[in-house]
């Protein structure tokens, strides 16, 4: 099985692209946000909810993995445990939002529950565009996302993706139309699978 991860900051267009790919017969798994009962609370009080929320995300991603682990086809996931640990949890630790006494437990669980991604497709948009998209779609759980938080995510992705082998990451311009982004993502998937 080959696992490809669609990634990007909040508001990049990951969910829209993943949903469109699913309609085109790709085996896709969107972020299991329906299991993230702590998400609405997170942006209201990050200090209180960051740690339990990141555990909740990790467990939900593992549950999702169990549903496709025996699949023989190529699987496309929206975000993955690597993102949870290296982007969101890492950023929360840097900002003193993650309970330091839980880091070892989180890392141990991550080692047991994470899975290997073969290729990342990063939909790149700047934080200004992402912020406008978030305001426009007006999701309840995202009402308190700050521009500064998006900017810090954008920077964190830039530094974290740079640690991966360049052959495992494709960067797509997410400022294009959704049709163009979808086309570019499909092209990236096909290029990766043909090598």
Curated annotation (Swiss-Prot):
This is Putative kinase protein 143R. Keywords: ATP-binding, Kinase, Nucleotide-binding, Transferase. ATP binds at residues 8-16. Belongs to the DCK/DGK family. Signal peptide: none annotated. The active site is at residue 78. It is an enzyme of class 2 (transferase). One of its GO terms (molecular function) is deoxynucleoside kinase activity. Its EC number is 2.7.-.-. Substrate binds at residues 31, 43, 54, 79, 142. It comes from Invertebrate iridescent virus 6 (IIV-6). PANTHER family: DEOXYADENOSINE KINASE (PTHR10513:SF35), DEOXYNUCLEOSIDE KINASE (PTHR10513). It holds the Pfam family dNK.
């Amino acid at each position: 099985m080959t696992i490809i991860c669609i990634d990007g900051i909040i508001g990049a267009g990951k969910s829209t692209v993943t949903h469109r790919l699913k309609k085109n017969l790709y085996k896709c798994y969107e972020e299991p946000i329906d299991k993230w009962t702590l998400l609405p609370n997170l942006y209201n009080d990050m200090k209180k909810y960051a740690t339990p929320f990141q555990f909740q995300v990790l467990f939900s991603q593992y549950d999702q993995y169990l549903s496709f682990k025996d699949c023989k086809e190529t699987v496309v996931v929206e975000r993955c445990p690597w993102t949870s640990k290296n982007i969101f949890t890492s950023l929360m630790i840097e900002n003193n939002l993650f309970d330091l006494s839980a880091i070892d437990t989180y890392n141990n669980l991550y080692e047991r529950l994470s899975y290997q991604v073969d290729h990342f497709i990063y939909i790149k948009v700047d934080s200004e565009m992402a912020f406008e998209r978030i305001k426009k779609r007006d999701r309840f759980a995202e009402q308190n996302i700050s521009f500064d938080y998006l900017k810090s995510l954008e920077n964190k992705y830039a530094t974290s993706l740079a640690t991966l082998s360049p052959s495992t990451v494709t960067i797509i311009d997410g400022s294009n139309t959704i049709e163009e982004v979808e086309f570019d993502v499909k092209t990236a998937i096909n290029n990766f699978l043909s090598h």
